[in-house]
Amino acid sequence: MRKYLNYIKGIFMLLLVVFLFAFSSSRNNARTPDSININFNGENPLFIAESNVDKMLIQNQEYIECVTKDVLDLKALESTISSHEMIETAEVYLTVDGGLKIDIEQRKPLARVVSDPSFYIDRQGQPMPLSDAYSARVLLVYGNVTNSNIEIIYQMLMAIENDAFLKIYATDLIIDAQNQISMRTRDCSFEILIGDLNRLDQKIINFKAFYQKAKKDSLLKDYKQVNLKFNQQVVGIK
């Protein structure tokens, strides 16, 4: 009989725990978020002020404050925030202490196209507007920049981004109407003619070899132009 009562007591305690857990979970889901915390990932300067994110949330404030956690559409909030032209991704989630957390990844510019109007090209190769909050110190692009050749420019920018030497020293790109590319570097007054992107890796190798040799011989200031268009050679014009 005692064994039977202990068995009944064990079942009762288990059911009580399940009930209390379900009751607590139900009450928690029935609550609205206690706080909203906005976090910008990384240490980069902000292209979008936190107040701009607040404005987007204010547009949804009544929804956020009135809707309980169990029906809060986090994906819809993510979509609203991610739609901002300076934001690449946004992750919205509920924290264990009852708050709403927003993690934001900003778009990252690779270069600034100097035109009217000027704009950035981001790491995805997409046009990105300038920011009123911060002006990025990035490589400048001049010349005939169009929707049809922005992919060519992006490929050149990524080649620079992925090369330790060019990432430090390259300052300007120029593209003409025939999509021929030229480049300028930080400590050289001469123009570097790259041409098209055929054999680009080899052209970069050739230029770095030329640069090191000319620098060693103190000849960098003597050149007006360096042409990388020719196969397996660098032509320097003084």
Predicted features along the sequence, with ranges:
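Extracytoplasmic/luminal low-complexity segments enriched in Pro/Gly and acidic/polar residues
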Residues: 198-238
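N-terminal membrane-targeting segments
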Residues: 1-68
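Periplasmic/extracytosolic POTRA-like scaffold domains at the N-termini of outer-membrane
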Residues: 42-85, 132-154, 205, 212-216
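Extracytoplasmic
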Residues: 33-35, 95-99, 115-116, 133-138, ...
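Structured, soluble extracytoplasmic/luminal domains of envelope-associated proteins
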Residues: 77-126, 225-227
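Short beta-strands and strand-coil junctions in structured, solvent-facing domains, enriched
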Residues: 88-89, 99, 109-111, 128, ...
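Extracytoplasmic segments of membrane-associated envelope/inner-membrane machinery
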Residues: 103-177
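Flexible glycine-/small-residue-rich
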Residues: 40-42, 104-108, 132, 143, ...
